[in-house]
Design a protein with these regions (language model features):
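Cationic, low-complexity basic patches in intrinsically disordered or flexible, solvent-exposed regions
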Residues: 5
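Short, Lys/Arg-enriched N-terminal segments with co-localized hydrophobic residues
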Residues: 9, 13-28
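Helix-start/capping segments and mature chain N-termini
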Residues: 26-108, 131-305
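Ordered, amphipathic secondary-structure segments that act as subunit-interaction surfaces
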Residues: 109-121
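Short, internal active-site loops enriched in acidic
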Residues: 122-127
């Protein structure tokens, strides 16, 4: 018997697929971590202190849901991963197909069939220096997967808004998340679930989610640009709207418009349909439950629930 795929780099920084024998009676794991070919439990994984992810947050990441050992929207996550790497000029010594094969193999090793899967790539391991490492230093791939209770949906999301002071490359899924961390903490301390970023009068996104609204039967969401992350769930909702005959407008909208929206929908990979009922302590949305349910049904149908 063989495990399927394991990525390692050659001295020419090209990936090769290596098949590794395993015993028939190998037990499944509670959780799993992977780092450049080594597999352990999450708590036992050791990562070099000179990994540039520690010094500079010099890397990118992705997170996906796993249902019945199948990675939901895997291709979308791989496309975004490679786009982010290209924008940061991080060289990836493997193809999308190789990464996808590795991830697909890793999630099979856990006891739980429903998982939260995370992976990141950093610019490599080298002594601290702001400049890119020289030749001979290849990127590092870290993966972990753990049991998950499943994608979350709610009709009771509470939001606050703050100025969006992040940098102008929010379309890159970078490890640099301090503004998002601070914003998420601010929401929690206010007794809320998420923070809405507002830049120059316009709503952009949330601390770890996209945000959209429904007004007069039209689904309205911020256009893809450098101010928001191209969310995978956002992408699929737009597709589902097309299938359901729901008009879509990709345009910037103001906080004032959000207050008067018929529905406010906060979306992410792990929280695909969070319906907001409060914004800055004011009641909002909750006026078109039928439309929201249609979108939720599309999601549940796709994950096989």
């Amino acid at each position: 018997m063989y495990t399927k795929y394991q990525i390692r780099r050659t001295t020419r920084h090209k990936a090769v697929l290596l098949e590794k024998k395993k015993k028939n009676n190998m037990e499944k794991m509670k959780d799993l971590a992977y780092y450049n070919g080594k597999i352990t439990s999450i708590d036992d994984m050791m990562i070099p202190a000179n990994d540039r992810g520690f010094y500079f947050g010099d890397g990118i990441y992705e997170a996906a849901m796993v249902f019945d050992y199948k990675i939901y929207a895997l291709q979308d996550h791989l496309d975004r991963m490679f786009n982010s790497a290209a924008m940061l000029r991080i060289e990836l010594p493997y193809t999308k197909e190789e990464v996808g094969a590795l991830l697909t193999d890793l999630v099979q090793k856990l006891e739980s069939s429903c998982q939260f899967l995370y992976w990141q790539v950093t610019r490599g391991t080298s002594p601290r220096n702001h400049l890119f490492p020289g030749e001979g230093v290849s990127s590092n791939l870290y993966v972990y997967s753990k049991p998950w209770k499943g994608a979350q949906m709610s009709d009771e999301y509470r939001l606050i808004s703050i100025p969006d002071t992040r940098f102008y490359h929010c379309n890159i899924k970078t490890l640099n998340l301090i503004p998002n961390v601070m914003a998420a903490q601010q929401a929690s301390e206010a007794g809320c679930n998420e923070t809405v970023f507002v830049r120059d009068g316009y709503v952009t996104e949330c601390s770890h989610s996209n945000i959209s609204m429904v007004k007069d039967g039209v689904f309205i969401t911020h256009p893809l640009d450098n101010l928001i992350l191209p969310g995978t769930e956002r992408k699929h909702i737009i597709r589902w709207c097309g299938e359901l005959g729901i008009p879509v407008k990709e345009r910037a909208f103001t906080l004032e418009e959000l207050y008067t929206a018929d529905e406010i929908l906060v979306t992410s990979t792990s929280h695909p349909s969070m319906r907001a009922m409060e914004l800055n302590q004011k009641a909002v949305g909750m006026k078109n439950p039928e439309l929201i349910q249609k979108l939720r049904d599309k999601y549940l149908n796709e994950i096989g629930k």
